[in-house]
A protein has these predicted regions:
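The feature marks proteins involved in alpha-glucan
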Residues: 1-64, 94-180, 185-192, 199, ...
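Conserved, mostly hydrophobic/aromatic
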Residues: 67, 119, 181, 208, ...
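Short proline/glycine-enriched turn/loop motifs at strand-loop junctions of beta-rich domains
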Residues: 68-75, 600-603
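Solvent-exposed beta-strand/loop surfaces of large extracellular or lumenal domains
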Residues: 81-103, 612-636
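C-terminal beta-strand-rich structural cap/linker in extracellular carbohydrate-active enzymes
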Residues: 113-116, 624-660
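Substrate-binding/active-site clefts of carbohydrate-active enzymes
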Residues: 141, 161-173, 182-363, 627, ...
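Conserved alpha/beta catalytic core and glycan-binding cleft of carbohydrate-active enzymes
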Residues: 143, 330-332, 347-515, 520, ...
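Catalytic cores of secreted or luminal carbohydrate-active enzymes
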Residues: 525-546
Length: 660
C-alpha cells in the first residue's frame, strides 16, 4: 500500500531522526468500523506492518503500528530504535466523527525487520501498566525480554505451489494418519539443545514419509513463555515460537513438508490465555479480552483467563488468527484444543461457581456461535482445509455442517474410543472376557461424528505411563498386546492419530524436557514395533476399504462381536465399490485354530498383514495365508471361512470374489 502525506518540515533528515508521524495525518486505512469487522483484513493490518509513505516527494519505508486499547489514556511503542523512551513514540488515537475505534497508531520511518519493541500503555486513570508484547506480533523473543520483533511476511518465497493448488477433496473419504509431535522433545542434540525448524526439515520429514504418515500434527507452536505448558498457554497467537527459529524457518519447514507430500496441522488454543503480565491480561487496564467475572472469565484448573466470546473484538481477533495461519504459513488444518471447555459454562465448576445462559442452561452460546463462524470462515477461504475438534463430551453435531445446525468442524477426536479401548486393553487377558462390552461399545456411536481415533499425548503423561507400559503381562506379552491393539485401531472406522514414540514402543512416560527413547531401536522388539507401524500406515493408505467409508456405517460390518469368552473380534471394512478387508483380533495369548467365521459371499481371503509376524518380533505362529470360503453357513450368513488367529494378534485379509 502506497500512502501519501504532506509535511510542514523541509528537513527530511530531521524528520527521520524524530521519525514519528501522526497516523491520522499520513495513513489511509479501511474505515475503522470496517477494519474491525473483517478478520481476513485484520491479520494484515493490525500490529507492526511494513509500509511505504511519500514524505516531501520521497518514498520512505517504515513500520506502521496499530493496536487496540480502547480504555488506555496513552499508548507508546518503545524499542531499541528510540532507546526505550516512551515519549519519543506516542501513538495517536484514531477517531472518526462520532466513532471512537479504540485503535492507536503510529508510523515510524526506516525501521527494519528484526527491530525489538513493546507497547507501553497507561490505563484510563493515567497509571502506567506493565510493558506489553504485541497481541498481533509476528515474531517474539524468549525469556527474559519477551520482546516483539518486526517481521515482514512477504519475504519468504514459497515453493509448494503444486501442493497448494491440488484439487479439493472430501477429507472424510481420504486416508488420514496423523503423527502428533512436540517439537522440543522429538529429538535433542547431544548437548540438550533443540532441533531447529530447518534441522527438523532434514530429519523429521524423511522419517515421517518413510513411516507412511499422511499428516504431521504439531502441538501448539504459537509463542508461549513457559516451555512446560507444551504450548497450551500461548501469549503470541500470531507468532510461531522462536525457540526453534524464525518465522521464515518455520515457513521453510512447512514448505518442505508439502514438497514431500506431507500435510501439516497445528494445535490451536482459543479456549484461554495465560495471566502473564506482558500478555493480554489487563491489556489496557481492563479485562479487555476476558469476562471480568471469574465465574465466566477465569479457568480454575489451568489458572488462566477465558476469552470473552461475546465481544466483537475478541471474536474477530480469534477468527483472524485462524485465517492467518492458513494464509501466511500454508497450514492444512487446525486442531482446536479444549473445545468442551468453551462449550459449557459449568465446565469443571461446582454449583455456584458459574453463571447460566439466558435460558438458564449451561451452553455458552457466544462460544458456540464463534466456533461456527471460525469454521465457516476457514472453509470458505480454504476449502481444502481441515478443522478438527478436541471435544470430550457428547455435544451434538460437532462435525455436522453449520447449515444443518452443527458446529461445522470437519472431524472430532474420538475420546470415547480412546478411553474405552485403553481400559479394555489394560486388563489382564484372562479378565478381558468380563469387559467385552467396553471394547465393542464405541461402535455404537462410531458414525455419529466424523471421528479421528486418537492415541494422543494426553495418554502418556501425568503418571499414566507409556502405551507400552499400559499393556499387561511380561515383556513379550506387553509388546504383543500393543501390536494387536494398534492393528485393531487401524482396522476400526475412523482416521488415525498416534503420538510420537508410539511407533518405537516407548517405555518411559513422555517428558517434554527430554527426547524420545531412540536407543530402544537397538532392541528387536522395538525395531519390530517401528516396522509394524510403518506397514500399518502403508497398508491403510493402500486399501480404500480401510478409509474410504470411515465416516459411513456402510463401510463396516461385524462378523463376530459377541465372542466374549474368547476375547475375539472380527469385522469387515468396505470401500465405495464394495471391496472388502476382513480384520480379526485375538486379545488372548491362546491361538485360535480353525475358528469359523460367517461371511456373505463366495471367494478367497488373502492375508495382507499379521501383527504376530516375526518381522515385527512376533511369534510367527503358523496361519493360513489364503482361505477359501466354504458353503457352510455360520453366524447367520450362507458361507464361512475357517481361520487361524495367532495369540495376541490382529490379522488383515483382503477379499477376492469368485469370478462372476
Amino acid at each position: 500500500m502506497n500512502l501519501s502525506v504532506t509535511f510542514h518540515s523541509d528537513n527530511l533528515q530531521q524528520l527521520e531522526r524524530a521519525a514519528y508521524c501522526d497516523l491520522n495525518q499520513i495513513v489511509t486505512l479501511l474505515p475503522c468500523a470496517e477494519l474491525l469487522r473483517d478478520p481476513a483484513a485484520m491479520c494484515n493490518e493490525m500490529g507492526a506492518q511494513f509500509r511505504e509513505v511519500t514524505i516531501n516527494g520521497a518514498l520512505v519505508a517504515g513500520v506502521r503500528f496499530l493496536v487496540y486499547a480502547p480504555h488506555a489514556s496513552s499508548v507508546a511503542v518503545i524499542g531499541d530504535f528510540n532507546g526505550w523512551h516512551a515519549k519519543e513514540c506516542q501513538l495517536t488515537r484514531l477517531q472518526q466523527p462520532n466513532i471512537d475505534s479504540g485503535l492507536w497508531g503510529i508510523f515510524i520511518p526506516n525501521l527494519q525487520a528484526g527491530e525489538r519493541y513493546k507497547y507501553q500503555l497507561s490505563d484510563q486513570y493515567g497509571n502506567q501498566l506493565p510493558d506489553k508484547t504485541d497481541p498481533w506480533g509476528y515474531y517474539a523473543e524468549q525469556y527474559p525480554s519477551f520482546c516483539s520483533l518486526t517481521y515482514q511476511q512477504s519475504c519468504y518465497q514459497w515453493q509448494d505451489e503444486m501442493w497448494q493448488t491440488r484439487p479439493v477433496t472430501a477429507k472424510h473419504q481420504q486416508p488420514l494418519s496423523f503423527y502428533e509431535l512436540h517439537i522440543g522433545s522429538w529429538r535433542r542434540h547431544d548437548n540438550g539443545d533443540f532441533y531447529t525448524y530447518r534441522e527438523l526439515a532434514q530429519t523429521l520429514i524423511p522419517y515421517l514419509t518413510e513411516m507412511g504418515y499422511t499428516h504431521l500434527e504439531l502441538m501448539p507452536v504459537s509463542e508461549h513463555p513457559f516451555h512446560g505448558s507444551w504450548g497450551y498457554q500461548p501469549i503470541g497467537l500470531f507468532a510461531p515460537t522462536s525457540r526453534f527459529g524464525s518465522p521464515d524457518d518455520f515457513k521453510y519447514f512447512i514448505d518442505q513438508c508439502h514438497q514431500a507430500g506431507l500435510g501439516v496441522v497445528l494445535d490451536w488454543v482459543p479456549a484461554h490465555f495465560p495471566a502473564d503480565e506482558h500478555g493480554l491480561a489487563n491489556f489496557d487496564g481492563t479485562a479487555l479480552y476476558n469476562d471480568p467475572d471469574p465465574r465466566r472469565g477465569w479457568h480454575q484448573d489451568w489458572k488462566s483467563y477465558i476469552y470473552d466470546y461475546g465481544r466483537d473484538h475478541v471474536r474477530q481477533f480469534l477468527v483472524s488468527n485462524a485465517l492467518f495461519w492458513f494464509e501466511h504459513f500454508h497450514i492444512d488444518g487446525l486442531r482446536v484444543d479444549a473445545v468442551a471447555s468453551m462449550l459449557y459454562l459449568d465446565y469443571s465448576r461446582n454449583d455456584g461457581e458459574w453463571i447460566p445462559n439466558a435460558d438458564g442452561g449451561n451452553y455458552n452460546y457466544d462460544a458456540i456461535s464463534l466456533l461456527r463462524w471460525i469454521n465457516e470462515e476457514v472453509y470458505s477461504h480454504y476449502p481444502n482445509a481441515m478443522m478438527i475438534a478436541e471435544e470430550s463430551t457428547a455435544f451434538p453435531g460437532v462435525s455436522k455442517p453449520t447449515s444443518l445446525g452443527g458446529l461445522g468442524f470437519g472431524f472430532k477426536w474420538n475420546m470415547g474410543w480412546m478411553h474405552d479401548s485403553l481400559a479394555y486393553i489394560k486388563e489382564e487377558s484372562i479378565y478381558r472376557r468380563y469387559h467385552h462390552n467396553t471394547i465393542t461399545m464405541p461402535l455404537l456411536y462410531a458414525f455419529s461424528e466424523n471421528y479421528i481415533l486418537s492415541l494422543s499425548h494426553d495418554e502418556v503423561v501425568y503418571g499414566k505411563g507409556s502405551l507400552m507400559n499400559k499393556m499387561p503381562g511380561d515383556e513379550w506379552q506387553q509388546t504383543a498386546n500393543l501390536r494387536a491393539y494398534l492393528g485393531y485401531m487401524y482396522g476400526q472406522p475412523g482416521k488415525k492419530l498416534n503420538f510420537m514414540g508410539t511407533e518405537i514402543g516407548q517405555t518411559a512416560e513422555w517428558n517434554h524436557d527430554d527426547q524420545l527413547q531412540w536407543f530402544l531401536l537397538q532392541f528387536a522388539r522395538h525395531q519390530g514395533m517401528k516396522q509394524l507401524v510403518k506397514d500399518l500406515n502403508h497398508m491403510y493408505c493402500a486399501y480404500p476399504a480401510l478409509y474410504q467409508l470411515d465416516c459411513d456405517p456402510a463401510g463396516f460390518e461385524w462378523r463376530i462381536s459377541d465372542a466374549a469368552d474368547d476375547s475375539l473380534l472380527v469385522h469387515e471394512r468396505f470401500d465405495i465399490v464394495e471391496n472388502k478387508v476382513l480384520v480379526a483380533s485375538n486379545f488372548t495369548p491362546v491361538p485360535r485354530e480353525q475358528y469359523r467365521i460367517g461371511v456373505p459371499l463366495e471367494g478367497t481371503y488373502e492375508l495382507i498383514l499379521n501383527t504376530d509376524n516375526s518381522l515385527y518380533c512376533g511369534s510367527d505362529y503358523s496361519l493360513i495365508t489364503t482361505i477359501k470360503t466354504e458353503v457352510k453357513g455360520s453366524h447367520g450368513l450362507p458361507y464361512s471361512i475357517a481361520m487361524v488367529i495367532p495369540p495376541l494378534a490382529t490379522v488383515f485379509y483382503r477379499f477376492i470374489p469368485n469370478p462372476a
